[in-house]
Design a protein with these regions (language model features):
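Charged, low-complexity intrinsically disordered terminal segments
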Residues: 1-99, 103-290
Length: 290
């Protein structure tokens, strides 16, 4: 993501459910600011449930000429936000879990990984092994259109409507200094820069697998319980299971197929299809009821 941000010439569109205020999160915000400072249009869409400690930094970024921040389905109370749940639970319980990072309309990263130390092996005690994909080609246009749908939805609020814009950027400067002061930051950054993936991106030698891809995404109106019938991912996945001819592979941290989903997958297996499901063990999950 940093390599793509540094190479951006026209635009960066980023949206995430969780963006943590830690070394990884602050470092990537710094890269987005640097891109905006050199004239790149930056749009950042975050879910309000996953950014509880970033109001000051996001408010500062939102004042920059080329930087715009919007918040999806914001809480009624800024602090503590959890108090909003009993006041407006039906709405507040509908969150935006979409994650994408699109640069110049030519490359995008999509998948399950949020932004934070625990998602990038930066935390020494906890690691979330989420899966994402770097993509180029026609699917980037689909991701861009989906981003625009969420960005322009009735549930996406300009950050300045929620938090009073700051008169200076001291909070942002302090956050950047905090990230740089971490003694392990330089070594971690170097190890990432030396990785085969980043070197392939920077050297334009990264080998891509060219395959047909279809993007499925919920209609953003689901946050208002107003999504038209047939516009949710769960609805779109059901017929795909029936159309499979050889195999079905599922990767999900929270695998809850329900009765209908279980029956569809079991039927496919009985018909001779190879069905593989990769999910958390009981020891690894962070949501025990799942």
């Amino acid at each position: 993501r940093m390599a793509l941000a540094r190479s951006a010439e026209q635009s960066i569109d980023a949206r995430y459910y969780i963006w943590q205020r830690d070394s990884t999160g602050l470092s990537l915000l710094k890269e987005l600011k640097a891109a905006a400072d050199r004239g790149v249009r930056v749009r950042l869409l975050v879910d309000d449930n996953g950014t509880p400690d970033l109001d000051a930094e996001l408010a500062a970024l939102n004042t920059l000429a080329n930087f715009e921040v919007r918040v999806f389905n914001p809480f009624s109370l800024r602090s503590p936000r959890l108090l909003s749940y009993p006041l407006d639970f039906p709405r507040i319980n509908r969150r935006m879990h979409n994650k994408s990072f699109t640069v110049d309309g030519v490359a995008t990263i999509v998948g399950g990984r949020n932004i934070g130390d625990i998602y990038f092996a930066r935390d020494t005690e906890v690691q979330y092994s989420d899966f994402d994909v770097l993509a180029t080609g026609a699917v980037v246009d689909d991701v861009a259109a989906d981003f625009d749908a969420y960005w322009n939805s009735a549930s996406a609020y300009p950050h300045e409507l929620l938090v009073t814009p700051p008169t200076d950027l001291s909070a942002l400067d302090a956050a950047s200094a905090e990230a740089e002061a971490d003694p392990d930051t330089a070594a971690y950054a170097q190890s990432v820069s030396d990785s085969r993936l980043v070197q392939g991106i920077l050297g334009h030698t990264l080998a891509l697998d060219w395959v047909p891809v279809t993007l499925l995404s919920d209609d953003p109106r689901k946050a208002l319980a107003d999504a038209p019938a047939g516009t949710l991912v769960a609805t779109a996945l059901a017929p795909l299971v029936g159309q499979a001819r050889q195999s079905i592979d599922v990767i999900s941290a929270y695998f809850v197929p329900g009765r209908e989903g279980t029956e569809r997958l079991a039927f496919a297996a009985r018909q001779g299809l190879r069905v593989r499901v990769l999910t958390n063990s009981l020891e690894a999950t962070d949501v025990l009821p799942v």
